[in-house]
Regions:
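Long, acidic serine/threonine- and proline-rich intrinsically disordered regions
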Residues: 137-140, 153-159, 415, 432, ...
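Post-signal peptide N-terminal segment of mature Sec-exported envelope proteins
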Residues: 32-83
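C-terminal motif of bacterial Sec signal peptides marking the signal peptidase cleavage site
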Residues: 21-24
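Charged, compositionally biased N-terminal leader segments and the immediate start
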Residues: 30-36, 50, 76-138
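Acidic/polar low-complexity segments with low predicted structural confidence
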Residues: 128-212
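Exposed acidic/Ser/Thr-rich ligand/metal-binding surfaces
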Residues: 26-36, 62, 196-420, 441, ...
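Bacterial N-terminal signal peptides that target proteins for export
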Residues: 2-12
Length: 618
Protein backbone atom coordinates (compact mmCIF):
# COMPACT_ATOMS: atom_id res chain seq x y z
CA UNK A 1 0.00 0.00 0.00
CA UNK A 2 1.54 3.34 -1.01
CA UNK A 3 1.72 6.42 1.23
CA UNK A 4 -1.42 7.98 -0.22
CA UNK A 5 -3.52 4.91 0.48
CA UNK A 6 -2.05 4.65 3.98
CA UNK A 7 -2.94 8.28 4.60
CA UNK A 8 -6.51 7.74 3.44
CA UNK A 9 -6.87 4.59 5.51
CA UNK A 10 -5.69 6.42 8.63
CA UNK A 11 -8.05 9.30 7.90
CA UNK A 12 -11.02 6.98 7.42
CA UNK A 13 -10.28 5.23 10.71
CA UNK A 14 -10.08 8.54 12.55
CA UNK A 15 -13.42 9.63 11.09
CA UNK A 16 -15.11 6.36 12.05
CA UNK A 17 -13.89 6.66 15.64
CA UNK A 18 -14.97 10.30 15.84
CA UNK A 19 -18.39 9.54 14.36
CA UNK A 20 -19.03 6.76 16.85
CA UNK A 21 -18.24 9.08 19.77
CA UNK A 22 -20.30 11.99 18.43
CA UNK A 23 -23.34 9.97 17.40
CA UNK A 24 -23.26 8.05 20.66
CA UNK A 25 -23.47 11.29 22.63
CA UNK A 26 -26.25 12.51 20.34
CA UNK A 27 -28.21 9.32 20.91
CA UNK A 28 -27.90 9.80 24.66
CA UNK A 29 -29.24 13.31 24.16
CA UNK A 30 -32.24 11.88 22.30
CA UNK A 31 -32.91 9.27 24.99
CA UNK A 32 -32.61 11.90 27.71
CA UNK A 33 -35.13 14.13 25.98
CA UNK A 34 -37.60 11.26 25.65
CA UNK A 35 -37.29 10.41 29.33
CA UNK A 36 -37.85 14.02 30.36
CA UNK A 37 -41.01 14.43 28.23
CA UNK A 38 -44.09 14.53 30.48
CA UNK A 39 -46.49 11.63 29.82
CA UNK A 40 -49.51 13.87 30.18
CA UNK A 41 -48.39 16.13 27.36
CA UNK A 42 -49.77 15.11 24.00
CA UNK A 43 -47.40 15.38 21.06
CA UNK A 44 -49.90 17.63 19.30
CA UNK A 45 -50.85 19.69 22.31
CA UNK A 46 -49.50 23.28 21.98
CA UNK A 47 -47.87 24.89 24.98
CA UNK A 48 -49.25 28.12 26.36
CA UNK A 49 -47.97 31.43 25.08
CA UNK A 50 -45.39 33.08 27.30
CA UNK A 51 -47.80 35.83 28.24
CA UNK A 52 -50.17 33.19 29.64
CA UNK A 53 -47.36 31.31 31.33
CA UNK A 54 -46.24 34.44 33.09
CA UNK A 55 -49.62 34.63 34.83
CA UNK A 56 -49.18 31.25 36.50
CA UNK A 57 -47.59 30.86 39.91
CA UNK A 58 -44.68 28.88 38.49
CA UNK A 59 -43.70 31.69 36.15
CA UNK A 60 -44.85 34.68 38.13
CA UNK A 61 -41.47 36.34 38.09
CA UNK A 62 -40.85 36.00 34.35
CA UNK A 63 -40.73 39.35 32.58
CA UNK A 64 -44.06 40.15 30.78
CA UNK A 65 -42.17 41.66 27.82
CA UNK A 66 -40.30 38.40 27.18
CA UNK A 67 -41.36 38.21 23.55
CA UNK A 68 -39.54 41.48 22.85
CA UNK A 69 -36.23 40.32 24.31
CA UNK A 70 -33.57 39.39 21.77
CA UNK A 71 -33.35 35.68 21.14
CA UNK A 72 -36.88 34.66 22.16
CA UNK A 73 -39.55 33.05 20.01
CA UNK A 74 -43.09 32.00 20.76
CA UNK A 75 -42.49 28.25 20.79
CA UNK A 76 -45.57 26.07 20.79
CA UNK A 77 -43.79 22.95 22.08
CA UNK A 78 -41.08 23.67 24.64
CA UNK A 79 -40.15 20.04 25.20
CA UNK A 80 -40.37 19.21 21.53
CA UNK A 81 -37.96 22.07 20.86
CA UNK A 82 -35.41 20.49 23.17
CA UNK A 83 -36.01 17.05 21.66
CA UNK A 84 -35.54 18.55 18.21
CA UNK A 85 -32.13 19.74 19.37
CA UNK A 86 -31.21 16.16 20.20
CA UNK A 87 -32.28 15.01 16.74
CA UNK A 88 -30.25 17.82 15.17
CA UNK A 89 -27.18 16.74 17.13
CA UNK A 90 -27.60 13.19 15.84
CA UNK A 91 -28.26 14.40 12.28
CA UNK A 92 -25.20 16.66 12.38
CA UNK A 93 -23.00 13.72 13.35
CA UNK A 94 -24.34 11.69 10.43
CA UNK A 95 -23.93 14.54 7.97
CA UNK A 96 -20.40 15.26 9.12
CA UNK A 97 -19.43 11.58 8.89
CA UNK A 98 -20.98 11.18 5.44
CA UNK A 99 -19.47 14.37 4.08
CA UNK A 100 -16.00 13.68 5.37
CA UNK A 101 -16.11 10.05 4.24
CA UNK A 102 -17.08 11.17 0.72
CA UNK A 103 -14.07 13.49 0.67
CA UNK A 104 -11.82 10.58 1.61
CA UNK A 105 -13.31 8.28 -1.05
CA UNK A 106 -13.07 10.92 -3.76
CA UNK A 107 -9.47 11.59 -2.76
CA UNK A 108 -8.50 7.96 -3.35
CA UNK A 109 -8.26 8.75 -7.07
CA UNK A 110 -6.10 11.85 -6.58
CA UNK A 111 -2.49 11.80 -7.64
CA UNK A 112 0.30 11.37 -5.12
CA UNK A 113 1.35 14.97 -5.70
CA UNK A 114 -2.09 16.30 -4.74
CA UNK A 115 -1.58 17.22 -1.07
CA UNK A 116 -4.25 19.93 -0.60
CA UNK A 117 -6.54 17.41 1.06
CA UNK A 118 -7.65 18.35 4.63
CA UNK A 119 -10.01 16.72 7.07
CA UNK A 120 -11.86 19.87 8.08
CA UNK A 121 -11.99 23.54 7.13
CA UNK A 122 -9.67 25.98 8.83
CA UNK A 123 -11.43 27.85 11.62
CA UNK A 124 -10.93 31.29 13.12
CA UNK A 125 -10.93 30.31 16.77
CA UNK A 126 -8.61 32.15 19.14
CA UNK A 127 -6.25 30.00 21.18
CA UNK A 128 -3.43 31.71 23.03
CA UNK A 129 0.01 30.29 22.29
CA UNK A 130 1.72 28.73 25.30
CA UNK A 131 5.39 29.47 25.95
CA UNK A 132 6.65 26.15 27.26
CA UNK A 133 8.30 26.05 30.67
CA UNK A 134 12.04 25.56 30.36
CA UNK A 135 14.49 23.37 32.21
CA UNK A 136 15.61 25.19 35.36
CA UNK A 137 18.92 24.75 37.19
CA UNK A 138 18.24 24.17 40.90
CA UNK A 139 21.53 25.76 41.95
CA UNK A 140 20.62 29.01 40.18
CA UNK A 141 16.80 29.13 40.52
CA UNK A 142 15.77 26.70 43.26
CA UNK A 143 12.25 28.09 43.80
CA UNK A 144 9.19 27.55 41.58
CA UNK A 145 5.87 29.31 42.33
CA UNK A 146 2.48 29.03 40.63
CA UNK A 147 -1.26 29.34 41.19
CA UNK A 148 -3.45 26.25 41.06
CA UNK A 149 -5.86 25.86 38.14
CA UNK A 150 -9.05 23.78 37.96
CA UNK A 151 -10.13 24.72 34.43
CA UNK A 152 -10.79 21.86 32.01
CA UNK A 153 -11.66 23.70 28.79
CA UNK A 154 -8.44 22.79 27.00
CA UNK A 155 -9.18 19.07 27.35
CA UNK A 156 -12.64 19.15 25.80
CA UNK A 157 -11.65 21.56 23.01
CA UNK A 158 -8.79 19.19 22.19
CA UNK A 159 -11.22 16.27 22.20
CA UNK A 160 -13.60 18.15 19.93
CA UNK A 161 -10.86 18.88 17.39
CA UNK A 162 -9.57 15.31 17.39
CA UNK A 163 -13.09 13.95 16.96
CA UNK A 164 -13.36 16.22 13.92
CA UNK A 165 -10.18 14.74 12.48
CA UNK A 166 -7.82 17.57 13.46
CA UNK A 167 -4.84 17.92 15.75
CA UNK A 168 -4.62 21.13 17.79
CA UNK A 169 -2.06 23.71 16.82
CA UNK A 170 1.19 23.14 18.66
CA UNK A 171 1.68 25.19 21.82
CA UNK A 172 -2.06 25.84 22.26
CA UNK A 173 -2.82 22.95 24.62
CA UNK A 174 -2.77 23.83 28.33
CA UNK A 175 -1.38 20.60 29.72
CA UNK A 176 -2.54 21.21 33.30
CA UNK A 177 -6.16 21.40 32.08
CA UNK A 178 -5.79 17.99 30.46
CA UNK A 179 -4.40 16.50 33.66
CA UNK A 180 -6.96 18.19 35.92
CA UNK A 181 -9.87 17.10 33.74
CA UNK A 182 -9.72 13.81 35.63
CA UNK A 183 -10.42 13.09 39.27
CA UNK A 184 -7.85 11.13 41.22
CA UNK A 185 -8.23 8.94 44.28
CA UNK A 186 -6.25 11.15 46.63
CA UNK A 187 -7.05 10.85 50.34
CA UNK A 188 -9.58 13.27 51.78
CA UNK A 189 -8.53 15.86 54.40
CA UNK A 190 -8.19 14.32 57.85
CA UNK A 191 -9.66 17.32 59.67
CA UNK A 192 -12.08 20.13 58.94
CA UNK A 193 -9.56 22.85 59.76
CA UNK A 194 -7.67 22.24 56.51
CA UNK A 195 -9.95 22.31 53.43
CA UNK A 196 -7.81 20.01 51.28
CA UNK A 197 -5.29 17.21 51.63
CA UNK A 198 -1.78 17.27 50.15
CA UNK A 199 0.14 14.23 48.97
CA UNK A 200 3.20 13.62 46.81
CA UNK A 201 4.64 10.74 44.79
CA UNK A 202 8.03 10.31 43.14
CA UNK A 203 8.85 7.78 40.41
CA UNK A 204 10.85 7.49 37.16
CA UNK A 205 9.63 9.76 34.36
CA UNK A 206 8.32 8.20 31.13
CA UNK A 207 9.41 11.23 29.09
CA UNK A 208 13.21 11.06 29.31
CA UNK A 209 15.84 8.56 30.40
CA UNK A 210 17.36 8.91 33.89
CA UNK A 211 14.83 11.53 35.00
CA UNK A 212 12.18 11.45 37.71
CA UNK A 213 8.59 12.66 37.91
CA UNK A 214 7.29 14.37 41.04
CA UNK A 215 3.51 14.51 41.46
CA UNK A 216 1.84 16.96 43.81
CA UNK A 217 -1.83 16.20 44.49
CA UNK A 218 -4.50 18.20 46.33
CA UNK A 219 -8.01 17.03 47.14
CA UNK A 220 -10.72 19.22 48.62
CA UNK A 221 -13.22 17.94 51.14
CA UNK A 222 -16.43 16.74 49.53
CA UNK A 223 -19.94 18.05 50.09
CA UNK A 224 -23.10 16.17 49.13
CA UNK A 225 -25.34 18.10 46.68
CA UNK A 226 -28.13 18.35 49.27
CA UNK A 227 -25.66 19.93 51.74
CA UNK A 228 -24.41 22.66 49.42
CA UNK A 229 -26.39 25.50 50.94
CA UNK A 230 -28.26 28.15 48.98
CA UNK A 231 -27.07 29.26 45.55
CA UNK A 232 -27.87 32.42 43.62
CA UNK A 233 -27.23 31.65 39.96
CA UNK A 234 -27.51 33.98 36.99
CA UNK A 235 -27.38 32.15 33.66
CA UNK A 236 -25.94 34.52 31.06
CA UNK A 237 -26.76 32.89 27.72
CA UNK A 238 -25.52 33.81 24.26
CA UNK A 239 -28.40 33.68 21.75
CA UNK A 240 -26.65 35.40 18.86
CA UNK A 241 -27.10 34.13 15.32
CA UNK A 242 -23.94 32.03 15.40
CA UNK A 243 -25.49 29.88 18.15
CA UNK A 244 -28.02 28.27 15.79
CA UNK A 245 -26.13 25.04 15.06
CA UNK A 246 -27.09 21.87 16.91
CA UNK A 247 -23.93 21.75 19.03
CA UNK A 248 -24.52 25.23 20.40
CA UNK A 249 -27.90 26.61 21.53
CA UNK A 250 -29.81 23.28 21.48
CA UNK A 251 -27.03 21.66 23.51
CA UNK A 252 -26.82 24.71 25.78
CA UNK A 253 -30.54 24.51 26.59
CA UNK A 254 -30.31 20.84 27.49
CA UNK A 255 -27.26 21.54 29.65
CA UNK A 256 -29.12 24.27 31.54
CA UNK A 257 -32.06 21.90 32.06
CA UNK A 258 -29.66 19.38 33.58
CA UNK A 259 -28.39 22.05 35.95
CA UNK A 260 -31.87 23.20 36.94
CA UNK A 261 -32.85 19.65 37.92
CA UNK A 262 -30.15 19.71 40.60
CA UNK A 263 -31.44 22.85 42.33
CA UNK A 264 -33.81 23.25 45.28
CA UNK A 265 -36.33 25.72 46.66
CA UNK A 266 -33.65 27.62 48.59
CA UNK A 267 -31.80 28.46 45.36
CA UNK A 268 -32.47 31.45 43.11
CA UNK A 269 -32.20 31.33 39.31
CA UNK A 270 -32.14 34.23 36.88
CA UNK A 271 -31.65 34.09 33.11
CA UNK A 272 -30.17 36.90 31.03
CA UNK A 273 -29.81 36.59 27.26
CA UNK A 274 -27.64 38.68 25.00
CA UNK A 275 -27.41 39.10 21.24
CA UNK A 276 -27.87 42.43 19.44
CA UNK A 277 -29.47 43.55 22.72
CA UNK A 278 -29.61 42.12 26.23
CA UNK A 279 -32.66 41.23 28.29
CA UNK A 280 -33.89 39.52 31.43
CA UNK A 281 -35.82 36.29 30.86
CA UNK A 282 -36.16 35.11 34.47
CA UNK A 283 -35.66 37.26 37.54
CA UNK A 284 -34.86 35.26 40.68
CA UNK A 285 -37.26 32.32 40.43
CA UNK A 286 -36.97 29.48 42.93
CA UNK A 287 -34.46 26.82 41.93
CA UNK A 288 -37.06 24.06 42.07
CA UNK A 289 -39.43 25.92 39.71
CA UNK A 290 -38.53 23.60 36.87
CA UNK A 291 -41.58 24.56 34.81
CA UNK A 292 -40.65 28.24 34.69
CA UNK A 293 -37.03 27.48 33.85
CA UNK A 294 -37.91 24.92 31.16
CA UNK A 295 -40.47 27.24 29.58
CA UNK A 296 -38.02 30.13 29.49
CA UNK A 297 -35.27 28.01 27.95
CA UNK A 298 -37.59 26.61 25.29
CA UNK A 299 -38.35 30.13 24.04
CA UNK A 300 -34.73 30.91 23.20
CA UNK A 301 -33.80 31.31 19.57
CA UNK A 302 -30.46 32.24 17.99
CA UNK A 303 -30.45 35.59 16.20
CA UNK A 304 -28.49 38.86 16.01
CA UNK A 305 -24.95 39.83 16.95
CA UNK A 306 -23.09 39.33 20.23
CA UNK A 307 -23.16 42.20 22.71
CA UNK A 308 -21.69 40.21 25.57
CA UNK A 309 -20.27 43.08 27.58
CA UNK A 310 -23.70 44.61 28.22
CA UNK A 311 -25.08 41.18 29.09
CA UNK A 312 -22.40 40.67 31.72
CA UNK A 313 -23.21 43.99 33.36
CA UNK A 314 -26.91 43.13 33.48
CA UNK A 315 -26.18 39.65 34.85
CA UNK A 316 -24.11 41.04 37.70
CA UNK A 317 -26.87 43.51 38.55
CA UNK A 318 -29.26 40.58 39.01
CA UNK A 319 -26.67 38.62 40.99
CA UNK A 320 -26.30 41.58 43.35
CA UNK A 321 -30.08 42.01 43.56
CA UNK A 322 -30.59 38.42 44.75
CA UNK A 323 -27.32 38.14 46.69
CA UNK A 324 -27.36 35.39 49.34
CA UNK A 325 -25.20 35.99 52.39
CA UNK A 326 -22.98 32.98 53.12
CA UNK A 327 -24.27 31.36 49.95
CA UNK A 328 -22.88 30.70 46.49
CA UNK A 329 -23.39 33.73 44.25
CA UNK A 330 -22.31 33.06 40.69
CA UNK A 331 -22.81 34.12 37.09
CA UNK A 332 -22.55 31.27 34.57
CA UNK A 333 -21.65 32.56 31.11
CA UNK A 334 -22.47 30.20 28.20
CA UNK A 335 -21.31 31.28 24.74
CA UNK A 336 -19.78 30.09 21.49
CA UNK A 337 -17.30 32.85 20.95
CA UNK A 338 -16.02 36.37 21.04
CA UNK A 339 -17.91 39.53 22.00
CA UNK A 340 -18.14 41.32 18.68
CA UNK A 341 -20.53 44.20 19.32
CA UNK A 342 -20.65 47.05 21.83
CA UNK A 343 -17.82 47.55 24.32
CA UNK A 344 -15.23 44.96 23.32
CA UNK A 345 -12.18 45.92 25.39
CA UNK A 346 -11.27 42.49 26.73
CA UNK A 347 -8.99 43.79 29.48
CA UNK A 348 -11.82 46.01 30.70
CA UNK A 349 -14.09 42.95 30.85
CA UNK A 350 -11.46 40.98 32.76
CA UNK A 351 -10.99 43.84 35.22
CA UNK A 352 -14.76 44.16 35.65
CA UNK A 353 -15.34 40.50 36.58
CA UNK A 354 -12.28 40.58 38.86
CA UNK A 355 -13.76 43.53 40.76
CA UNK A 356 -17.10 41.73 41.07
CA UNK A 357 -15.42 38.62 42.48
CA UNK A 358 -14.10 40.75 45.34
CA UNK A 359 -17.74 41.54 46.13
CA UNK A 360 -18.52 37.83 46.45
CA UNK A 361 -19.89 37.13 42.96
CA UNK A 362 -17.93 34.57 40.96
CA UNK A 363 -18.01 33.81 37.24
CA UNK A 364 -17.85 30.41 35.56
CA UNK A 365 -17.58 30.18 31.77
CA UNK A 366 -18.97 27.44 29.52
CA UNK A 367 -17.94 27.30 25.87
CA UNK A 368 -20.10 25.75 23.15
CA UNK A 369 -19.24 24.85 19.57
CA UNK A 370 -16.32 26.05 17.52
CA UNK A 371 -16.36 29.00 15.15
CA UNK A 372 -16.60 28.93 11.37
CA UNK A 373 -16.58 31.62 8.72
CA UNK A 374 -16.67 35.01 10.43
CA UNK A 375 -17.52 33.50 13.83
CA UNK A 376 -14.70 32.82 16.26
CA UNK A 377 -14.47 30.94 19.53
CA UNK A 378 -12.31 32.84 22.01
CA UNK A 379 -10.83 30.15 24.24
CA UNK A 380 -8.30 32.54 25.74
CA UNK A 381 -10.86 35.15 26.82
CA UNK A 382 -13.18 32.61 28.46
CA UNK A 383 -10.24 31.12 30.36
CA UNK A 384 -8.99 34.53 31.51
CA UNK A 385 -12.46 35.67 32.62
CA UNK A 386 -12.96 32.62 34.83
CA UNK A 387 -9.40 32.80 36.19
CA UNK A 388 -9.88 36.38 37.36
CA UNK A 389 -13.36 35.80 38.78
CA UNK A 390 -12.94 32.81 41.11
CA UNK A 391 -14.52 30.46 38.60
CA UNK A 392 -13.96 27.52 36.33
CA UNK A 393 -13.79 27.33 32.54
CA UNK A 394 -15.19 24.27 30.76
CA UNK A 395 -15.96 23.55 27.12
CA UNK A 396 -19.24 21.66 26.57
CA UNK A 397 -19.08 19.58 23.41
CA UNK A 398 -21.45 16.74 24.38
CA UNK A 399 -24.29 15.99 26.77
CA UNK A 400 -21.87 13.75 28.66
CA UNK A 401 -19.62 16.76 29.26
CA UNK A 402 -22.60 18.85 30.39
CA UNK A 403 -23.52 16.14 32.87
CA UNK A 404 -19.94 15.91 34.14
CA UNK A 405 -19.64 19.65 34.81
CA UNK A 406 -23.20 20.52 35.88
CA UNK A 407 -24.36 17.31 37.57
CA UNK A 408 -21.55 14.97 38.63
CA UNK A 409 -19.24 17.82 39.69
CA UNK A 410 -21.88 20.32 40.75
CA UNK A 411 -20.44 20.67 44.26
CA UNK A 412 -17.03 21.60 42.85
CA UNK A 413 -18.59 23.94 40.30
CA UNK A 414 -20.72 25.87 42.79
CA UNK A 415 -18.99 25.62 46.18
CA UNK A 416 -15.52 27.12 46.63
CA UNK A 417 -13.81 25.80 49.77
CA UNK A 418 -10.52 27.73 49.53
CA UNK A 419 -9.35 30.62 47.41
CA UNK A 420 -6.05 32.19 46.38
CA UNK A 421 -4.34 28.79 46.57
CA UNK A 422 -0.63 29.10 45.74
CA UNK A 423 2.07 26.46 45.44
CA UNK A 424 5.76 27.10 46.04
CA UNK A 425 8.40 24.41 45.91
CA UNK A 426 12.07 24.83 46.76
CA UNK A 427 14.37 22.22 45.24
CA UNK A 428 17.46 21.12 47.12
CA UNK A 429 20.54 21.79 44.94
CA UNK A 430 22.47 19.18 46.94
CA UNK A 431 20.16 16.52 45.46
CA UNK A 432 18.47 18.02 42.39
CA UNK A 433 20.38 19.46 39.46
CA UNK A 434 17.47 20.47 37.19
CA UNK A 435 13.67 20.61 37.21
CA UNK A 436 10.82 21.45 34.84
CA UNK A 437 7.22 22.32 35.72
CA UNK A 438 4.84 20.64 33.26
CA UNK A 439 2.02 23.01 32.35
CA UNK A 440 0.73 26.01 34.34
CA UNK A 441 2.57 28.37 31.98
CA UNK A 442 -0.02 31.13 32.34
CA UNK A 443 -0.40 30.57 36.09
CA UNK A 444 3.22 31.25 37.07
CA UNK A 445 3.86 33.67 39.94
CA UNK A 446 6.87 35.61 41.13
CA UNK A 447 8.63 34.19 44.15
CA UNK A 448 7.58 37.20 46.24
CA UNK A 449 3.92 36.74 45.20
CA UNK A 450 3.68 33.65 47.38
CA UNK A 451 3.64 35.61 50.64
CA UNK A 452 1.76 38.58 49.20
CA UNK A 453 -1.91 38.11 50.06
CA UNK A 454 -2.88 40.89 47.65
CA UNK A 455 -1.87 38.71 44.69
CA UNK A 456 -4.79 36.72 43.27
CA UNK A 457 -4.57 32.97 42.70
CA UNK A 458 -6.83 30.03 41.89
CA UNK A 459 -9.69 28.47 43.81
CA UNK A 460 -10.45 24.88 44.74
CA UNK A 461 -14.02 23.61 44.91
CA UNK A 462 -15.60 20.91 47.05
CA UNK A 463 -14.30 17.51 45.98
CA UNK A 464 -11.92 19.00 43.42
CA UNK A 465 -8.57 17.34 42.80
CA UNK A 466 -5.62 19.40 41.59
CA UNK A 467 -2.47 17.82 40.19
CA UNK A 468 0.91 19.29 39.28
CA UNK A 469 3.90 17.46 37.81
CA UNK A 470 7.61 18.29 37.84
CA UNK A 471 10.21 16.39 35.85
CA UNK A 472 13.49 16.47 37.79
CA UNK A 473 17.07 15.34 37.32
CA UNK A 474 19.23 14.33 40.25
CA UNK A 475 22.83 15.43 40.53
CA UNK A 476 23.98 11.90 39.68
CA UNK A 477 21.82 11.76 36.53
CA UNK A 478 23.63 10.92 33.29
CA UNK A 479 21.04 12.92 31.35
CA UNK A 480 21.65 16.46 32.61
CA UNK A 481 20.87 19.13 30.05
CA UNK A 482 22.96 21.91 31.60
CA UNK A 483 26.68 21.69 32.26
CA UNK A 484 27.85 22.85 35.71
CA UNK A 485 29.57 26.23 35.83
CA UNK A 486 33.35 26.22 35.78
CA UNK A 487 33.86 28.91 38.41
CA UNK A 488 31.23 28.03 41.03
CA UNK A 489 32.15 26.07 44.15
CA UNK A 490 28.83 24.27 44.05
CA UNK A 491 29.95 20.93 45.45
CA UNK A 492 31.76 22.33 48.50
CA UNK A 493 28.84 24.62 49.25
CA UNK A 494 26.40 21.71 49.12
CA UNK A 495 28.61 19.63 51.42
CA UNK A 496 28.84 22.47 53.94
CA UNK A 497 25.06 22.95 53.83
CA UNK A 498 24.56 19.25 54.48
CA UNK A 499 26.78 19.43 57.56
CA UNK A 500 24.98 22.48 58.93
CA UNK A 501 21.52 21.07 58.14
CA UNK A 502 21.87 17.28 58.24
CA UNK A 503 18.09 16.80 58.43
CA UNK A 504 17.68 18.36 54.97
CA UNK A 505 20.58 16.55 53.29
CA UNK A 506 18.30 13.90 51.77
CA UNK A 507 15.36 16.17 50.98
CA UNK A 508 14.51 16.45 47.30
CA UNK A 509 12.38 19.54 47.82
CA UNK A 510 10.33 21.52 50.32
CA UNK A 511 6.69 22.06 49.38
CA UNK A 512 4.75 25.08 50.68
CA UNK A 513 1.12 26.00 50.04
CA UNK A 514 -0.84 29.11 50.91
CA UNK A 515 -4.60 29.46 50.84
CA UNK A 516 -7.34 31.66 52.22
CA UNK A 517 -10.27 30.10 54.00
CA UNK A 518 -13.67 31.28 52.82
CA UNK A 519 -14.42 34.74 54.19
CA UNK A 520 -10.83 35.29 55.37
CA UNK A 521 -8.40 37.90 54.07
CA UNK A 522 -5.21 36.45 55.56
CA UNK A 523 -3.67 33.32 54.07
CA UNK A 524 -2.63 30.20 55.94
CA UNK A 525 0.61 28.29 55.32
CA UNK A 526 1.15 24.54 55.21
CA UNK A 527 4.49 22.84 54.47
CA UNK A 528 5.65 19.36 53.45
CA UNK A 529 9.21 18.05 52.99
CA UNK A 530 9.71 15.65 50.07
CA UNK A 531 12.39 13.07 50.83
CA UNK A 532 14.38 10.91 48.47
CA UNK A 533 13.17 7.85 50.41
CA UNK A 534 9.86 8.37 48.59
CA UNK A 535 11.59 7.60 45.29
CA UNK A 536 10.23 4.47 43.58
CA UNK A 537 12.65 2.38 41.56
CA UNK A 538 10.33 1.56 38.65
CA UNK A 539 7.44 3.43 37.04
CA UNK A 540 5.13 0.41 37.29
CA UNK A 541 5.42 0.63 41.10
CA UNK A 542 3.68 4.00 41.07
CA UNK A 543 -0.05 4.33 41.70
CA UNK A 544 -2.63 4.16 38.92
CA UNK A 545 -3.32 7.85 39.42
CA UNK A 546 0.37 8.72 39.02
CA UNK A 547 0.80 6.69 35.85
CA UNK A 548 -2.45 7.90 34.30
CA UNK A 549 -1.67 11.55 35.02
CA UNK A 550 1.78 10.99 33.50
CA UNK A 551 0.17 9.58 30.33
CA UNK A 552 -2.23 12.53 30.04
CA UNK A 553 0.55 15.07 30.57
CA UNK A 554 2.68 13.24 28.03
CA UNK A 555 -0.15 13.48 25.50
CA UNK A 556 -0.41 17.23 26.00
CA UNK A 557 3.34 17.62 25.56
CA UNK A 558 3.30 15.60 22.33
CA UNK A 559 0.50 17.81 20.97
CA UNK A 560 2.53 20.89 21.85
CA UNK A 561 5.66 19.35 20.28
CA UNK A 562 7.44 19.96 23.58
CA UNK A 563 11.18 20.34 23.11
CA UNK A 564 11.99 18.60 26.39
CA UNK A 565 10.32 15.25 25.67
CA UNK A 566 12.64 12.80 23.90
CA UNK A 567 11.84 9.27 25.05
CA UNK A 568 8.10 8.75 24.57
CA UNK A 569 5.55 8.42 21.78
CA UNK A 570 1.86 7.64 21.30
CA UNK A 571 2.35 3.87 21.54
CA UNK A 572 4.15 4.15 24.89
CA UNK A 573 1.53 6.55 26.27
CA UNK A 574 -1.33 4.29 25.18
CA UNK A 575 0.30 1.36 26.97
CA UNK A 576 0.91 3.49 30.06
CA UNK A 577 -2.67 4.81 30.19
CA UNK A 578 -4.19 1.36 29.63
CA UNK A 579 -2.18 0.03 32.57
CA UNK A 580 -3.59 2.70 34.89
CA UNK A 581 -7.36 2.75 34.31
CA UNK A 582 -8.29 2.35 37.98
CA UNK A 583 -11.99 2.16 38.81
CA UNK A 584 -12.96 4.71 36.12
CA UNK A 585 -16.50 5.07 37.44
CA UNK A 586 -17.72 7.35 34.64
CA UNK A 587 -15.59 5.97 31.82
CA UNK A 588 -13.54 9.14 31.31
CA UNK A 589 -10.23 7.28 31.30
CA UNK A 590 -11.44 4.79 28.70
CA UNK A 591 -12.60 7.71 26.57
CA UNK A 592 -9.15 9.28 26.89
CA UNK A 593 -7.45 6.12 25.64
CA UNK A 594 -9.71 6.10 22.58
CA UNK A 595 -8.90 9.75 21.93
CA UNK A 596 -5.20 8.98 22.32
CA UNK A 597 -5.49 6.22 19.73
CA UNK A 598 -7.33 8.51 17.32
CA UNK A 599 -4.68 11.19 17.76
CA UNK A 600 -2.02 8.58 17.04
CA UNK A 601 -3.73 7.75 13.74
CA UNK A 602 -3.98 11.43 12.83
CA UNK A 603 -0.35 12.00 13.76
CA UNK A 604 0.77 9.16 11.47
CA UNK A 605 -1.39 10.54 8.68
CA UNK A 606 -0.08 14.10 8.89
CA UNK A 607 3.51 12.89 9.02
CA UNK A 608 2.98 11.73 5.44
CA UNK A 609 2.12 15.25 4.31
CA UNK A 610 4.29 18.33 4.12
CA UNK A 611 5.41 19.52 7.58
CA UNK A 612 3.61 22.84 7.18
CA UNK A 613 0.24 21.07 6.91
CA UNK A 614 0.73 18.97 10.03
CA UNK A 615 -1.04 21.27 12.46
CA UNK A 616 -4.43 22.87 11.94
CA UNK A 617 -4.27 26.67 12.19
CA UNK A 618 -6.43 28.11 14.95
Amino acid sequence: MNNTHKQLTHSALAIVISAIIISGCAQESKDSAKQNQPESTSKNQPASKIQSASKTDSSAQARPELSEVAGLVMASEPQADLYQGSKELHRSAKVMTSSMAQRIVSSQHASVSDRNFSLAPTINDKFESVVQNGNMVAGETPVSTFSIDVDTGSYSTTRRLINQGQLPTKNTVRVEELVNYFSYDYPLPTNTEQPFSVNTELAPSPYNADTQLLRIGLKGFDVAPDKLGASNLVLLLDVSGSMSSADKLPLLKQAMLMLSQQLSAQDKVSIVVYAGASGVVLDGVAGNDFTAIKTALSQLNAQGGTNGSQGIQLAYQLAQKHFIENGSNRVILATDGDFNLGMTDHQQLVDFVASQSKKGIGLSTLGFGLGSGTASYNDHLLEQLSNKANGQYAFIDTLNEARKVLVDQLSATLLTIAHDVKVQIEFNPAVVSEYRLIGYENRLLNRSDFNNDAVDAGEIGAGHTVTALYEIRYNDSHNRLVDPLRYTATESTQIDDAKVHPHTANEVAYLKLRYKAIGEQDSQLITYPINREQQLTHLHQASDDFRFAAAVAGFGQLLNQNNYVHDTDYAKLITLAESAMGQDRFGYRHEFVQMLKTASVLDKQVLMTEPETRWVSQ
